[in-house]
Amino acid sequence: MSKKLTKKQIEQLSQFTVDELLGVIHDLSEKYGEINQYLAMNYLMSPEEKLKNIENEYKRQFRKKGNYEYWKSHAFFLDLENKTVRSLDSLALGLPLETVKITEKMIGEADDLFEKYDTSSGSWQDYLYGLLNVWIKALGAAYKKDNQVDFVGHYLEVKSNCDYYFPSDLLQNNKAFVPREVIQKI
């Protein structure tokens, strides 16, 4: 069985009525639980509901016992990145202040998380660097939306809290989201 729909199959789907498509979606969601989550997260929730869902998922993952087995730890960080960081990335421009708040909390708790898991695979770095990129994107959007946001203060605080892990090229890689005057101040 192929993983992608062929052109012919897509053409057949385009000929379905709205009711037939709703029936297909309903059947799929009854048989496969992941489809329910995907539909809800990507199409049926407001941005505020998505943010709350992401925050709850992060709390659930953070409370897990921890594991020092290589592959389980590797899978944990990949899963955490997929379920939280990528979802936050889609909200960073729409809800910047809220995204900054939750990402700063997650960055602040990163060391506690790293102590509970084997970090030799390096997937923790993908998680953290993805999180830092979402944070800087949201912080830049919050600054552009409201110049009263203390971009430099937030930046220096997070940098000092995770200086060991902080990538030196973070601002350079996210120039599109960071105002020029802020880069000059830093």
Show where each model-derived region lies.
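Eukaryote-biased, non-catalytic alpha-solenoid scaffold regions
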Residues: M1-E11, E30, E34-I186
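Long, hydrophobic or amphipathic alpha-helical segments
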Residues: V18-L28
